[in-house]
């Protein structure tokens, strides 16, 4: 879908809300995949629904002068790492890795994102952020290495 929109576009972010421990969307969850087109200066989002259906959205780029209201960091097109890693683990592997560092009974993943939040261990690089319904959030590197809690 992304390459049909713009062959030069690059994926910049993956974000899941209300995800099962197996990595699949719950009945009220969804996965979002965002791409950036330098040529068009626009974002392209694919929202994958639990039933397998999807929605496609095109959005303008944020104002280059925009800044995060908490960190005061300039907002770029989207995503932490500007170069997507050549290889990266999928959400199922990232969730399993994070679960191995979590105590207590877990029921779901409230949020799972790749290249959306920055890890202090690997600044400027893509990492998974996994947040369960109980306990802390966890950073997992693109290579599957556990990076710590957040």
Predicted stretch roles:
Residues 1-150:
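Long, terminal "pre-/pro-" and other extracytoplasmic accessory regions
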């Amino acid at each position: 879908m992304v390459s049909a929109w713009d062959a030069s576009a690059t994926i910049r972010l993956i974000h899941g809300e209300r995800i099962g421990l197996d990595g699949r969307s719950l009945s009220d969850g969804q996965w979002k995949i965002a791409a950036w087109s330098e040529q068009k200066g626009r974002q392209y989002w694919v929202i994958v629904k639990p039933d397998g259906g999807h929605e496609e959205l095109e959005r303008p780029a944020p104002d280059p002068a925009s800044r995060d209201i908490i960190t005061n960091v300039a907002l770029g097109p989207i995503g932490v790492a500007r170069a997507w890693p050549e290889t990266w683990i999928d959400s199922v592997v990232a969730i399993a890795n994070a679960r191995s560092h979590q105590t207590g009974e877990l029921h779901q993943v409230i949020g799972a994102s790749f290249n959306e939040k920055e890890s202090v261990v690997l600044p400027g690089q893509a990492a998974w952020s996994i947040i369960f319904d109980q306990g802390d959030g966890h950073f997992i590197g693109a290579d599957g290495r556990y990076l710590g809690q957040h």
